[in-house]
Amino acid sequence: MKENWYMFFKMLIKHEGGFTDDERDNGNAKGDGHGNKGSTMLGVTAWTWAEYTGKPAPIEVMKALTEEDVKPLYKKNYWDVVKADNLPSGVDISTADMCVNAGPSRAAKILQKSTGGLTVDGAIGKKTIAAIHDRDPKEVLNNYYYGRQKFYESLDDFEHYGKGWTRRNKETLELALSIV
């Protein structure tokens, strides 16, 4: 839902935190595509920022990013991509957060599995949106939580990042259920 965008962004920034250039983080592995070392600021990787702006994203650029800088990127590249304005309240936040964390296709597939009876194609279209609106949003959200957690636990780096991913998943579910 359109009115949940700001609530989502506030939660997202809390989860994504500040600057990191942790080489174990897959998001930092590619660098920025212009020969600069990979880094992440407010959850935005150097690669993503360079793609979004069309300019190199060296560490000094990444460290200078503000919430206001990254807000339009999150709206365009994540919230809008999963059509969050068209999703039920709560489902929008969970789906958009997973889109940031694991990409739009993964977020859509988990949503489609959570809804049941849908072709799992990784794209949120009219059929997916209609099916979600026909389901109990609390049931969809709980299914989404378990699908998301199963995905995290399947990752090789769950041992290192799993505690944070699990906390994020739980906090996202709690917020989402509170606005259904």
Language model region names:
Residues 1-180:
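Cell-wall polysaccharide-cleaving catalytic domain and substrate-binding groove, primarily
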